[in-house]
């Protein structure tokens, strides 16, 4: 925000250790600088709150009821409600202006404006420049996979990345193909990026129908990246970027083995796919372009204008049918696993 706009922004994190060893760059740690944090909150024109906090009684010890507040959701409402001990209806129906990450979550927040997860392309370029990458046109292909949870694809609709099932399929493939699998989690962000950049292929997530920041970062570094976006998520990406194409190799998990085998057999195809994905990201997910979604939202909130969605949610087309297709994919995945 500070680099690309004239907005003076500070990021206050109440608990930087919330993800354990999976750490990120920080600005202000509230627990280390509570008074500075409260002074910044008091002087701010706008408070951009991530996740849900009570405006009157919250861990920051400040009353936000008279401030311009913009809520920003990163999880589906039931997950937020469970951890905040608040009713789903209170979250979804809250009259304060709302943003929601432009992934699967947006279909459940009809009042929220979808916004992109922005990339620090300069930081990714520095990591790429500092990380040796060996060309392996005929040797073993290296695949990186970094799930943040080990929840099964069969037990949750959204709170999963299908890690157990994905790993079962990859292990089978490794037994008969020139494939090395680098699986990692709970690493500092910069280290995770270096591990990915050393790979030929990256798997984002292939079971829910959504994409994640991990896949965007991989494609920004020119890596061949597999993901699976359902029809609603695809439409949201199109509305956000204006592009009708996708940079992911878009494939559900049950169909991934054939796709991966083709990629493993062809270094030329991997190079082409990686370059195409990188070109798409640099042209359509450029931070300088996409940051306008935030700037416009801030301007609307400060001037008392409602936030406008560019893509309305239809219960049948955007929720019921994608859920039906997901159930079909899960059944096909079960058959795929049983055939092995």
Residue ranges: model-predicted function:
Residues 268-299, 303-305, 319-321:
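A charged, aromatic-enriched C-terminal amphipathic alpha-helix characteristic of glycosyltransferases
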Residues 12-94, 100-104:
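Extended catalytic core of nucleotide-activated donor transferases of GT-like folds
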Residues 119-187:
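Conserved catalytic-core segment of nucleotide-activated headgroup transferases in glycan assembly
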Residues 224-233:
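Short hydrophobic beta-strand element within catalytic cores of glycosyltransferases
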Residues 206-207:
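Aromatic "clamp/platform" in nucleotide-sugar-dependent glycosyltransferases that forms part
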Residues 93-138:
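Donor nucleotide-sugar binding/catalytic pocket of nucleotide-sugar-dependent glycosyltransferases
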Residues 197-199, 217-224:
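Conserved donor-binding/catalytic loop of nucleotide-activated donor transferases
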